[in-house]
Structure formats: structure tokens, C-alpha cells
Amino acid sequence: MNKTTAETNQDIAYLLSNNLSRLLSEFSRDFERRIWQALDARGYPDIRPSHSAVFANLGLGAVRVTELAERAQVTQQAMGKMLKELERMGYVARDVDSDDKRAKEIRLTEPGIELVTDSLAVVDEVRGHYATKLGGMQELEKLEASLRDAVRKLELDYLPESWVDPQRG
């Protein structure tokens, strides 16, 4: 039986909207939307999704701007713009690198540490929501483990090894 043009178009539309890239994007978009809404409700209305490139790659130590940009996979110019915004809001501070006086290091301020702490609590809340929807925490953890395994096998790891494996740092 031959398919009609409408059926073929419907098949193509389905395939375009239900591929791995789209599914991962939708999941990520929903996860991040829930996080930003919760942070806004907790008193962080100026924090934007782009700022996660800083917080997800900074940690609690001091990091040079160049390394931070590399970890976040953005240009130094883009990282500098985000850092200026976060510095103006009081979440990060720039210090002179003790090893190289020409370089600047970025560190979290006390309000920045509070924001990170609140962010971690929000992530736990969002994970709880997903666990409920997916059939329990064990199902969510299996999904996370599968994604981590895929990232490792595809050699997409870009974090410092000590962040990936605490035994190494």
C-alpha cells in the first residue's frame, strides 16, 4: 500500500520532532526552566540561564578567566561579559592571580556561595519532581547513569578529572 503525501509528511514531521537531539533538548529545556523559576521564587530574579556557564564550571576555588571560559566552552569575551554581570550583582569577585600578576582569578563571594547552595537545593527539588514522573528515584538515577556513560564513551568529558573522579584530585 502506497503512502499518501500527507502520510509521508506526517512521518517526516514525526521523525524530525522525535529524534535524540530534540528529546534531549526538550528535557534539558524543561529542567532548566524549572530551575530558573525556582531560583526566581527564592529571590534571584536577575540570574539567567547563561550564568550557569559560570556557576557550573567555577566550583568553590579561584579559577582564571581563561580556564573558566575553556571549561564552559565559550569565548573569553563571552565569559568576561557574564562575569561582569555577576560581579555587578555581587556573586563573584576578581582577584589578581598570586602566580601571575597579569592574570585575574574569579571566585565566589558569600552571596555567590549562598546562590550556589540554593541552586543545589533547587536541583534536588527538580530531580525529585522528575523522579516522581519517571517512576521513582531509581529510574531517574538509571537515566543519569546512562547519560554519564554515553558522555564518557563518546569522550565528551570536558571537566577537570578531579571533578569527574574525586579520587584523582
Which role does the model predict for each range below?
Residues 65-66, 77, 84, 104:
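Residues within helix-turn-helix
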Residues 1-13, 137-169:
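C-terminal regulatory/oligomerization modules of transcriptional regulators
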Residues 4-6, 84-148:
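Charged, amphipathic alpha-helical coiled-coil/dimerization segments
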Residues 1-46:
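N-terminal leader segment of winged-helix/HTH proteins
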Residues 33-75, 164:
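N-terminal helix-turn-helix DNA-binding core of bacterial DNA-binding proteins
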